[in-house]
């Protein structure tokens, strides 16, 4: 019998599914023994047990599926059940227990047990034994005790048994088994842990591979006494420390225990620890089962028995498949490959990375993949080269994360593109290639490459070269070729690098760094600067107080002051999980953290100073790192070859950052719920069909629902967030258009619209690429504020704004005011008419204050108005962040002001209301006396009444407190509802009842817009008596607080009503009932199975008014054109007294002029004649004189109005404060603008000024010295309260202003071009024509120059060149520009005067000197200027004569630098004998020594040699000699006997003629040294060529001569011999050598036997080609040995 089954170590195994340890029994096939092995498990974590016990109680359901814990989630409220607190002295509920669990207040299970016992004892003491609460408490307490006992019993292990068990296990493992076999099994177990991923593709073992950093987590080592990680376990595997699987299992248990002890239950690390244990034991059990199954099929040899006890894996499978599968060469030697992979895993874990910080902050990366690519892994291993090449092409993405190969997934449609199949004879797509891969139709990689190339060539043949698909093809071909080369370099049987070894190896890591990795590395460096900063004297870490946020218990005010808390833990987590799109995001969070510290703490405190120091260090380090390098500065991007997931073949679904944002917006709208947990988006998920709701599709022209939005998102149809938001807005607008404004759907649409806007704002807050649209932000804020106020509800779900719908639009006290209601405000908000928050607040407060004025203080409307006004102020302050986001005059009215106004109003109203109540009571008393008198006079029957508590009628008993239906006065009406308060029988024997009457909504007077609860009635002020004979039946009226939770027994739903308010027939008003005072009923109430939802319905009068609304639709459409105007705040002219004012002038602080309100401090555009842009003036004084208005203030000028260097840069929209202060009439004002300081320009905007009219000013321009100097700021004015201040919106993140070049730069360029126009006029046409031709066919810069045959020389015509290379043209133009200067009088004057001024002002810059020279020239007399012009003309004539002589000189005697005297030096590829110096003789058809088609060069160029004078060749001349053909089989080597004639013998040896260097290729040798003809015989001699040997401009140093002494080689051979060695060479080292481990110098590469190969082929270098040859030779050797069974050779 195996060991007893029990729970796993972690108590969370009940949730996470940890395996129990019963599998130990399989490894002991001896006789059965009842042995307890509980001590093998680590100690149970008490915190985890507490969480498990709580979860068990919380999740328990009864037979009906109801959660029993719902009865104990919250203790009864003292207001509802005060008697509960008389019985229970220590109330407690599950919410308090959960809170204590979160705060880790339970150190022991006994503490949790005590609280649960208190909870259930309280329930038993208060509730009756037959109540559901009592029964649930008993059940849950029994469940708790059982579960606790199961967990606590795990500590009953015996240490002695554990030791014996361990010895037994070791004995069974080591007996008959080798250490290598054990090591292989342990590596398999480790591999299962390392490669395990969660469903999203994240590596579970990532944080367990290395221990946490002692710098970042010092408390970890204080809590954990025995730290261990996977690296340590890997080292122990390699060192052979484990003698059994049981020993490794102990370390895995310790690893999981440490993680669960340090981390909170429920955290990701806690769950990962459980998963690692689960994976380990799953793999262990799988190995056991697999080995036992195999052993049962084979003979039980001793070795097999030992293997069974060891539970080792089988490696024999697949051998038969190799013989049958043609592609089996990629799967041969699977055991060896697997062993190599496992060893790579353990070795990678053993050595790890050199940087602990890199490992601590490393996040798992997975290659992007789609569902189709994931499906391939089901039939093909990801290490297969076929799969890697296919997936590289298929998964390649561009910079935006889009799949480049997406158009190639499927073939084009034959219907849409019939011509495609006419042009393309062999169409193919990735889908077909995938099918071939699945069917294993590819024998080699070349076959797969051919199909991919066929697909690409098809696309190139069908599409235009400049099309997007054509460019994609080029990119994919480049990627495919690079991947193919890499796969060819690797050994086919090698599985590739493991994830960790490749991620942590230093070799080649710099080449694989992408821009993303560099960005992350920079963030880690900046983070470590803050983390490791210490105080110089004491060594205190400055970041200690910034690691975690302050405790809410100790610092509750912190979270009221700081609205966005931030700490280093959050920043570190964001870096790890790649939450930052760039470095700026992390810097912003750092700055936010430091800003919070300075905002909360006093200036001068330690935290304040630390924040300042750390921020300074961060800025300095960032400045030191410099800007992030561009893509071009980094190495070429490598293909993603799963380097970081080499041992994790599965790929995760990749989402681009944009897709993640879109998904976040969608999920935020979809998952939003209200306070009651109702998901608002349910109604918007799918539209009703046309058959269900045909009128909807008649009204809505563009239907939209969330399913359609989701399908668009999945199809990648949204390119940005705004396009998705547009569809959401359309959907919500459709809902608001079709549904009534007071309907539930309408309000849900508004709320979800608000959620949508908030989510988009949060997501786009990280982008600083553009200036936010302040107008839209203000309108969005006002919209959110309005929706929040109108949706504000009480505890029962009633909207406070419902009662205010009855407020009249016009105040009777102010009949002249325009009407204003919430409906009018809503239309203004929807039409974006509000541009100021204070105006919107005025309108809202006007409606609410009117409601307060027109209603009593104890009325429901009054109380709702006060509540909405308080809520408005609260939400307004939250949205504006108390002025941090929006600074508005509206913020000056606070809750304190509201309370004062309400108290003052109540003091004024209360005496009047008391008097009204007194008069009302007297009137009611008089009416009651009258009714009693009339009833007494009617008869004496009332004097003989017999009262009772109940009576019977028609076999029914009626009690006092019952609700009954009473026969209506008219037959068509519904029966009345009466609550019986008295029952009696008169002397005549007739039974009567007296009670309060309840009215239905249609029996009250109310507005059609009012909404009511379903089945709602109202308690009236009408009481009367009715004969019992008129009773029609029973019903029940319940108070609103009980109606939704309880239901009466034995009553139908239609006979149950709800009452929330009382109705006064005299005042025709409703008032909410606070205390239910009706008589106690005999009806028994029970809890509802499911609480009723709070649903309000429209009034029955609403349908009647709907027709009137439809009649007014046409009028509203006509008036919609008038709805686009903006509402303006009421302002007034504000005069001001000026002590030093001029007589007759009336001064103002604020003035209305020409439909524009202007105040002191405003900036305006003023008319400026002759300027490109109007100047800007600032109003510092405003006055009116004789009916004309004027203002006075400084003038701002634009950059083009200042004198400055053309190279100076300016901010966009920058202006400068000038020295001018002018008085201007108001008639010259063109419009308002705003001039902001640099700091304000980055951070805020006035809300009423368009962005185009926002200007930046940080400098003052001094006209006298032409200097720009920064100044502190503009003058500020203190204005009266009547002046309306501007509202200022502050950005969440400062913007980055862009600079632009000076406007004078273009003018300066045009001026210079005009000066040189005359000089370059003649040559420009030729050069431009040559440049146009060169753009069509651009010759190669260094073409291969080949020696023509004799027959070809005779046929080569003379073709003069038609184009000039750009490099040559540029050099010629540069040279010519130095010679050709258009001399003018000013240039001559400047050359003479500049030296004089320079001597007078030695400290002046070049620009300042030029400005002074220009001033002197302008001040020069006319006669002097004419004299300079005359002298300049003579100089120009002399230069022209010299230029003409130079142009004629080449025809007679060529000189260096001319086309005739320059030859192109072409360097051929290296030959086995070294670089041969060949001689090239000019031939017919050459232009100055160039073959046809090669352009001449102007001037010396690198690689060219300028020759001396040389006679030109004539087309009719004799054919020159050419080089003899090379020796057969050795291209490029001349025959013997030719070396001493036309070719230098060797590089570095003296050439004939005494020159110490050999002639360069293509350079003519000395006279008389010409090559002989290839065959004997006479030939016509050409004219002699006169040459002047010149020194080459560039001579490469000769290569170093390498000698190999035979004696040295023999000595090395003798030293290598050893008696212990079976071979002469170190063949094992040679066999293990790899290309990436061997680095060759250039000298070593030059000595490689490159002559073995014709060329390097598709390889990058010749060394790579030789490595490939070596691999092929080794493989062939192995194949020959295996094919012929050469085991003993």
From Swiss-Prot:
Changing residue 226 to G: Found in hematopoietic and lymphoid cancer cell lines. This is Protein polybromo-1. SMART domains: BAH (SM00439), BROMO (SM00297), HMG (SM00398). The keyword Nucleus applies. Changing residue 674 to E: Found in a case of clear cell renal carcinoma; somatic mutation. Changing residue 925 to Q: Found in a colon cancer cell line. The gene is PBRM1. It comes from Homo sapiens (Human). Residues 1-39, 155-177, 487-517, 625-646, 902-941, 1106-1133, 1354-1378, 1431-1460 are annotated as: Disordered. It is linked to Renal cell carcinoma: Renal cell carcinoma is a heterogeneous group of sporadic or hereditary carcinoma derived from cells of the proximal renal tubular epithelium. It is subclassified into clear cell renal carcinoma (non-papillary carcinoma), papillary renal cell carcinoma, chromophobe renal cell carcinoma, collecting duct carcinoma with medullary carcinoma of the kidney, and unclassified renal cell carcinoma. Clear cell renal cell carcinoma is the most common subtype. Residues 41-151, 177-287, 381-487, 518-625, 653-763, 769-879 form the Bromo domain. GO terms for biological process: chromatin remodeling; mitotic cell cycle; negative regulation of cell population proliferation; positive regulation of cell differentiation; positive regulation of double-strand break repair; positive regulation of myoblast differentiation; positive regulation of T cell differentiation; regulation of G0 to G1 transition. The modification Phosphotyrosine is found at residues 134, 1289. Changing residue 206 to K: Found in hematopoietic and lymphoid cancer cell lines. The modification Phosphoserine is found at residues 10, 39, 131, 178, 316, 319, 353, 355, 371, 375, 498, 509, 636, 648, 689, 948, 987, 1119, 1405, 1453. GO terms for molecular function: chromatin binding; DNA binding. Changing residue 228 to V: Found in a breast cancer cell line. The lineage of its organism: Eukaryota, Metazoa, Chordata, Craniata, Vertebrata. Changing residue 1177 to S: Found in a kidney cancer cell line. Changing residue 66 to G: Found in a colon cancer cell line. Its main location: nucleus.
């Amino acid at each position: 019998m195996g060991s007893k089954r029990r729970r796993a170590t972690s108590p969370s195994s009940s949730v996470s599914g940890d395996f129990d340890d019963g599998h130990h029994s399989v490894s002991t096939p001896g006789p059965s023994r009842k042995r307890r092995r509980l001590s093998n498990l680590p100690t149970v974590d008490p915190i985890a047990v507490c969480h498990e016990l709580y979860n068990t109680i919380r999740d328990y359901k009864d037979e009906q599926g109801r959660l029993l814990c719902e009865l104990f989630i919250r203790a009864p409220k003292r207001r509802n059940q005060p008697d509960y607190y008389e019985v229970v002295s220590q109330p407690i509920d599950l919410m308090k227990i959960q809170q204590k669990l979160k705060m880790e207040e339970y150190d022991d299970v006994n503490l949790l047990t005590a609280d649960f016992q208190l909870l259930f004892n309280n329930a038993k003491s208060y509730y009756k034994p037959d109540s559901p609460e009592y029964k649930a408490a008993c059940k849950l307490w029994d469940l708790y005790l059982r579960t606790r006992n199961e967990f606590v019993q795990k500590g009953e292990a015996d240490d002695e048994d554990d030791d014996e068990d361990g010895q037994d296990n070791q004995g069974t493992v080591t007996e008959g088994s080798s250490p290598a076999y054990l090591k292989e099994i342990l590596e398999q177990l480790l591999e299962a842990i390392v490669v395990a991923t969660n469903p999203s593709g994240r590596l579970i073992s990532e944080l367990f591979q290395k221990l946490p950093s002692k710098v970042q987590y010092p408390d970890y080592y204080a809590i954990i006494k025995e730290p261990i990680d996977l690296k340590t376990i890997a080292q122990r595997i390699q060192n052979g420390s484990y003698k059994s699987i049981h020993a490794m299992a102990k370390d895995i248990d310790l690893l999981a225990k440490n993680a669960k002890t340090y981390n909170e239950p429920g955290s990701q690390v806690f769950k990962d620890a459980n998963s690692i244990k689960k994976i380990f034991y799953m793999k262990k059990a799988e190995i056991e089962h697999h080995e036992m199954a195999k052993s049962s099929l084979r003979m039980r040899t001793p070795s097999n028995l030992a293997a069974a006890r060891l539970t080792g894996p089988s490696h024999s499978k697949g051998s038969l498949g190799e013989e049958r599968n043609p592609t089996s060469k990629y799967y041969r030697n699977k055991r060896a490959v697997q062993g190599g992979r496992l060893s790579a895993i353990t070795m990678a874990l053993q050595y790890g990375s050199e940087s602990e910080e890199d490992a601590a902050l490393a996040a798992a990366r997975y290659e992007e993949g789609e569902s189709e690519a994931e499906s391939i892994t089901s039939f093909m291993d990801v290490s297969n080269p076929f799969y890697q090449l296919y997936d590289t092409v298929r998964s390649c993405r561009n910079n935006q994360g889009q799949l480049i190969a997406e158009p190639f997934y499927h073939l084009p449609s034959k219907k849409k593109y019939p011509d495609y199949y006419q042009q393309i004879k062999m169409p193919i797509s990735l889908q077909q290639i995938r099918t071939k891969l699945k069917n294993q139709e590819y024998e080699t990689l070349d076959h797969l490459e051919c199909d991919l190339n066929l697909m690409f060539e098809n696309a190139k043949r069908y599409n235009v070269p400049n099309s997007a698909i054509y460019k994609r093809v080029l990119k994919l071909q480049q990627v495919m070729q690079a991947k193919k080369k890499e796969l060819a370099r690797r050994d086919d049987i090698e599985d590739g690098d493991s994830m960790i070894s490749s991620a942590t190896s230093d070799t080649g890591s710099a080449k694989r760094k992408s821009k993303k990795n560099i960005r992350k590395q920079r963030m880690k460096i900046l983070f470590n600067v803050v983390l490791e900063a210490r105080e110089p004297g004491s060594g205190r870490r400055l970041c200690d107080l910034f690691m975690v946020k302050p405790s809410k218990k100790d610092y509750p005010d912190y979270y009221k002051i700081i609205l966005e808390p931030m700490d280093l833990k959050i920043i570190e987590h964001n870096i790890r999980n790649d939450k930052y799109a760039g470095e700026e995001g992390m810097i912003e969070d750092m700055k936010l953290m430091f800003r919070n510290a300075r905002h909360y703490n006093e200036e001068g405190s330690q935290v304040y100073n630390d924040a300042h120091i750390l921020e300074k260090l961060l800025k300095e380090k960032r400045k030191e790192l410099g800007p992030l390098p561009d893509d071009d500065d980094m190495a070429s991007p490598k293909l993603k070859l799963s380097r970081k997931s080499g041992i994790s073949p599965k790929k995760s679904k990749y989402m681009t950052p944009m897709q993640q944002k879109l998904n976040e917006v969608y999920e935020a709208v979809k998952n939003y719920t209200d306070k009651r947990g109702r998901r608002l988006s349910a109604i918007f998920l799918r539209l009703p069909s046309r058959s269900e709701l045909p009128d909807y599709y008649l009204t809505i022209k563009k239907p939209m629902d969330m399913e359609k939005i989701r399908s668009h998102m999945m199809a990648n149809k949204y390119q940005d967030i705004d396009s998705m938001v547009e569809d959401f807005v359309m959907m919500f607008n459709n809902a608001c258009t079709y549904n009534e404004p007071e309907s539930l759907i309408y309000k849900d649409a508004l709320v979800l619209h608000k959620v949508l806007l908030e989510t988009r704002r949060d997501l786009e807050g990280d982008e600083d690429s553009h200036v936010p649209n302040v107008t839209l932000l203000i309108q969005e804020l006002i919209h959110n504020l309005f929706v929040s106020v109108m949706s504000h509800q009480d505890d029962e779900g009633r909207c406070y704004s419902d009662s205010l719908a009855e407020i009249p639009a016009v105040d009777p006290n102010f009949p002249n005011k325009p009407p204003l209601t919430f409906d009018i405000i809503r239309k203004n908000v929807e039409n974006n008419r509000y541009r100021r928050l204070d105006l919107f607040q005025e309108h809202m407060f006007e409606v609410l204050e009117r409601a307060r004025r027109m209603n009593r203080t104890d009325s429901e409307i009054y109380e709702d108005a006060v509540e909405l006004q308080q809520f408005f102020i609260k939400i307004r302050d939250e949205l504006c962040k108390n002025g941090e986001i929006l600074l508005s005059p509206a913020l000056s009215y606070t809750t304190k002001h509201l309370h004062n106004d309400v108290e003052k109003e109540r003091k004024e109203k209360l005496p009047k209301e008391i008097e009204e109540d007194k008069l009302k009571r007297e009137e009611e008393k008089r009416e009651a006396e009258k009714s009693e008198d009339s009833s007494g006079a009617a008869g004496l029957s009332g004097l003989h009444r017999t009262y009772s508590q109940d009576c019977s009628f028609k076999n029914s008993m009626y009690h006092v407190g019952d609700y009954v239906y009473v026969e209506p006065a008219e037959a068509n009406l519904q029966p009345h509802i009466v609550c019986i308060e008295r029952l009696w029988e008169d002397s005549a024997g007739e039974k009567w009842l007296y009670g309060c009457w309840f009215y239905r909504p249609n029996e009250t007077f109310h507005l059609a817009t009012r909404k009511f609860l379903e089945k709602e009635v109202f308690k009236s002020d009408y009481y009367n008596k009715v004969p019992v004979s008129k009773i029609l039946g029973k019903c029940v009226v319940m108070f609103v607080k009980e109606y939704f939770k309880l239901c009466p027994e034995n009553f139908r739903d239609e006979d149950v009503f709800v009452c929330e308010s009382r109705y006064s027939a005299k005042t025709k008003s409703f008032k909410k009932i606070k205390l239910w005072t009706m008589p106690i009923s005999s009806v028994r109430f029970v809890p509802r199975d499911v609480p009723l939802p709070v649903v309000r319905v429209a009034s029955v009068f609403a349908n009647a008014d709907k027709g009137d609304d439809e009649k007014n639709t046409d009028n509203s459409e006509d008036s919609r054109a008038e709805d686009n105007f903006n509402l303006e705040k009421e302002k007034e002219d504000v005069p001001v007294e000026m002590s030093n004012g001029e007589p007759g002038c009336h001064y103002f602080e604020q003035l209305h002029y020409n439909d524009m309100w202007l105040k002191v401090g405003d900036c305006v555009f003023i008319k400026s004649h002759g300027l490109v842009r109007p100047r800007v003036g600032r109003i510092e004084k405003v006055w009116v004189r004789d009916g004309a208005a004027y203002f006075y203030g400084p003038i701002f000028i634009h950059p083009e109005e200042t004198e400055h260097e053309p190279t100076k840069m300016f901010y966009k929209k920058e202006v400068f404060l000038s020295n001018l202060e002018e008085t201007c009439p108001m008639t010259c004002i063109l419009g308002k603008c705003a001039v902001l300081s640099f700091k304000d320009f980055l951070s805020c905007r006035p809300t009423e000024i368009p962005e185009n009219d926002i200007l930046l000013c940080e400098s003052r321009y001094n006209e006298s010295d032409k200097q720009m100097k920064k100044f502190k700021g503009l003058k500020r004015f203190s204005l009266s309260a009547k002046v309306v201040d501007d509202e200022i919106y502050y950005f969440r993140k400062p913007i980055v202003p862009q600079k632009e070049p000076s406007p004078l730069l273009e003018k300066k360029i045009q001026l210079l071009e005009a000066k040189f126009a005359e000089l370059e006029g003649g040559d420009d046409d030729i050069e431009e024509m040559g440049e146009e031709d060169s753009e069509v066919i651009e010759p190669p810069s260094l073409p291969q120059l080949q020696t023509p045959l004799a027959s070809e020389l005779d046929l080569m015509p003379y073709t003069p060149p038609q184009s000039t290379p750009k490099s040559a043209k540029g050099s010629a133009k540069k040279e010519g520009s130095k010679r050709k200067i258009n001399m003018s009088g000013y240039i001559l004057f400047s050359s003479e005067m500049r030296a004089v001024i320079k001597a007078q002002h030695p400290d002046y810059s070049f620009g300042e000197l030029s400005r002074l020279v220009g001033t002197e020239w302008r001040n020069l007399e006319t006669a002097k200027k004419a004299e300079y012009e005359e002298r300049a003309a003579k100089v120009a004539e002399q230069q022209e004569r010299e230029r003409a002589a130079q142009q004629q000189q080449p025809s007679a005697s060529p000189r260096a630098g001319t086309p005739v005297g320059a030859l192109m030096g072409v360097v051929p590829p290296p030959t086995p004998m070294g670089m041969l110096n060949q001689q090239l003789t000019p031939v017919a058809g050459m232009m100055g020594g160039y073959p046809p088609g090669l352009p001449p060069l102007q001037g010396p160029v690198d690689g060219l040699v300028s020759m001396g004078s040389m006679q030109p060749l004539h087309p009719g001349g004799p054919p020159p000699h050419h080089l003899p053909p090379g020796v057969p089989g050795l291209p490029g080597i001349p025959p013997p006997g030719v070396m001493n004639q036309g070719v230098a013998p060797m590089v570095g040896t003296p050439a004939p003629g005494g020159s110490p260097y050999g002639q360069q290729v293509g350079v003519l040798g000395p006279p008389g040294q010409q090559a002989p003809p290839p065959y004997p015989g006479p030939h016509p001699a050409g004219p002699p060529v006169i040459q002047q040997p010149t020194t080459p401009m560039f001579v490469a140093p000769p290569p170093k001569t390498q000698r190999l002494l035979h004696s040295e080689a023999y000595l090395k051979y003798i030293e290598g011999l050893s008696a212990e060695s079976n071979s002469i060479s170190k063949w094992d080292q040679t066999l293990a050598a790899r290309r990436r481990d061997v680095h060759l110098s250039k000298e070593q590469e030059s000595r490689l036997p490159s002559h073995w190969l014709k060329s390097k082929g598709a390889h990058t270098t010749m060394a790579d080609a030789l490595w490939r040859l070596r691999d092929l030779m080794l493989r062939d050797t192995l194949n020959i040995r295996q094919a012929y069974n050469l085991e003993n050779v």
